[in-house]
Amino acid sequence: MTHRRILAGCIPLRWRELIVGLVAANCIGIGWGRAEPPAKPKPRTSAMVRDEDRNFRLYVKSWTELPKENVVLQQRDYSCGAAALATMIRYHWGDNVTELQLLLEVVKMLSEEELKERVKNGLSLTDLRRLAVRVGYEAAIGRLEFDKLRESKIPLVVGIVVNKFDHFVVYRGMDDEFVYLADPARGNVRTPIAEFKKQWQKNAVLVVVKPNGDLKKISPLLVSGEELFLGELNRRYLRDQTTTKFVPY
């Protein structure tokens, strides 16, 4: 992939509560390809829990459902940018857009020569910003220091490098050890903070905001307390299984 210069737009005043320290940035592009609408989510499984005083139904998410929940998975090798943007629009702002619909807008947005260049070198973060604006959103690109990333109150599209390949994901939040991502290729994943810092491309972010949208809405795309709790349980389990226990004679 080739590097491209991109210019950050002015960050609207109403976004300053969400992001602090956005300035002009560079980011590496990513390719795109054809896509199909993501499969409809399967209905939740349920289990009855009983006691002497009352009955109630508890909906249980299976382990196979959790990694793919609230993520638009890319349908082609190079469609992660469109899938990441679709994830933001669908699961944070609530508009039922598909990866394929966004890719068709890319075809309308770019000239024939530009399309040939993008097929060869990939979409840039600037292309995703233009695409977001084209489908009715406010969008801006900037650079954000890592310490300020935690303060974001909305998800952000970011570029990372994984195994020497450029890739777009959605930043969802972090705890003291991990950064949580909605990855169009892998689903919901968490990456150790030190590793994410190495992967993050030039600290560039894409902010996408729905006009007149609620900036403080509760979003299913943001990291939930349940996820953080499950993560802590996993850490404790692994620690207990890998720590040698010495029992005195």
Summary of predicted features, one role per range:
Residues 3-19:
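Bacterial N-terminal signal peptides that target proteins for export
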